[in-house]
């Protein structure tokens, strides 16, 4: 996918020193409905509602913070959901440290992380990026599962709600 290529060849590549605005804007259009250059009918993952300057800063900050970029790569590649949840918790914890905190990355609603997970692998990650919207959907359809939106860690909420919704729709006969 374009997002995987961007992550591997731009974010993680030490020889690619600077992210160009147009490179980030292309990825922003994949992630965010309101990204610069998106038009009605454009395909996108979510409505991040992050302004272009903040989006560019977020990706440049990730690129310039090798430990966080590596944790995110590990999150994308981890197939065990429990381990993935732990890595997400580690990302949230590490991103709280000043002065290197990356704004917009680890939010209470987890929208940027969930959008990136979906862009990385849309077959295994849902495009409902907001945890609040996931909770509303789970409640509405009464999907079985054990996501505790009040007490689970950020990582647990992200991976459990993703799986709960996928399994819930499968139980309704949808693939």
Residue ranges and their predicted role:
Residues 1-106, 123-175:
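An N-terminal alpha-helical hairpin/helix-loop-helix interaction module that forms a charged
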Residues 100-118:
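Helix-hairpin-helix
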């Amino acid at each position: 996918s374009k997002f995987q290529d961007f992550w591997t060849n731009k974010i993680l590549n030490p020889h690619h020193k600077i992210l160009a605005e147009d490179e980030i804007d292309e990825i922003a259009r994949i992630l965010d409905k309101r990204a610069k250059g998106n038009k009605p009918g454009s395909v996108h993952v979510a409505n991040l509602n992050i302004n272009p300057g903040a989006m560019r800063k977020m990706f440049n900050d990730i690129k310039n913070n090798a430990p966080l970029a590596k944790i995110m790569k590990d999150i994308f590649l981890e197939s065990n959901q429990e381990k993935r949840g732990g890595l997400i918790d580690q990302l949230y914890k590490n991103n709280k440290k000043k002065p290197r905190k990356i704004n917009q990355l680890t939010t209470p609603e987890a929208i940027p992380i969930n959008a990136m997970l979906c862009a990385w692998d849309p077959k295994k990650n849902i495009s409902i990026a907001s945890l609040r919207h996931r909770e509303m959907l789970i409640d509405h359809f009464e999907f079985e599962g054990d996501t505790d939106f009040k007490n689970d860690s950020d990582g647990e909420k992200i991976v459990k709600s993703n799986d709960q919704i996928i399994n819930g729709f499968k139980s309704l006969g949808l693939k």
